[in-house]
Regions:
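DUTPase catalytic domain/fold
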Residues: 1-210
Length: 210
């Protein structure tokens, strides 16, 4: 597999081999394209109380250790359709707190029917302690392509409290060539827009087994 250069990404966008919408040539790098952060976030309901507590400085300062213990006793269930709470990043910014998983999204629909897309965090964001995904940087061939344009869900977490802003350049997408007969992506997140919670529970049978 070979990674497309920046000029080749531009060429493939013009040819239709790569989908990036909206597209701004100023955001093309040597081998990547910068994607921006959508204002909409999701937080799992079990995790939301921790975000609220940190937002209320008095609660955080009063007994942070108790808060950490309380949250650790409310695990997410991979076999359950876990409810979420919606947040919006205002123009003035929103503080992301350690220990809270924020599901974000890119503003851009990005992908390809011909190449394998992959997202990674920008090094400038990483140097502030911001991670843009946990393990899901790889997109399958066909994800976000012309047949089913899609935004990317970002699994945002931080090492230290960080203020983030809507439409900030948060991550970058790259594209790699493939070998062999293609099997286009047709998974549960095809055509998604905005942040999407885990659909892993769909893999489990009625009794909780896979």
């Amino acid at each position: 597999m070979a990674m497309l250069t920046g000029p080749e990404i531009v060429r493939q966008v013009r040819l239709g081999g790569v989908t990036i919408d909206p597209f701004d040539p100023a955001r093309v790098g040597s081998n990547s394209y910068d994607l921006t952060l959508n204002p909409d976030l999701l937080v799992y309901a079990k995790n939301h109380a921790r975000h609220v507590a940190f937002e209320t400085s008095a609660a955080c300062d009063a007994n942070p250790n108790k808060l950490l213990r309380w949250c650790s006793n409310r695990p997410l269930d991979m076999a359950a359709d876990e409810p979420t709470v919606a947040l919006t990043i205002p123009p003035a910014g929103l503080v992301l707190w350690p220990g809270v998983l924020y599901l974000g999204a890119t503003n851009e629909r990005a992908g390809s029917d011909d190449f394998v897309p992959r997202i990674d965090g920008r090094s400038s964001a990483g140097r502030l302690g911001i991670a843009t995904h946990v393990t899901s940087g790889l997109g399958d061939q066909g994800f976000g392509g012309a047949a089913a344009p899609a935004t990317w869900t970002l699994e945002l977490f931080v090492v230290v409290p960080v203020i983030v802003y809507p439409y900030a350049r948060i991550c970058q997408v790259t594209f790699e060539t493939v070998e062999g007969e293609p099997k286009p992506y047709a998974g549960k997140y095809a055509g998604q827009t905005g942040p999407r919670a885990s659909g892993l529970w769909r893999d489990f049978g009625p009794k909780g087994g896979v």
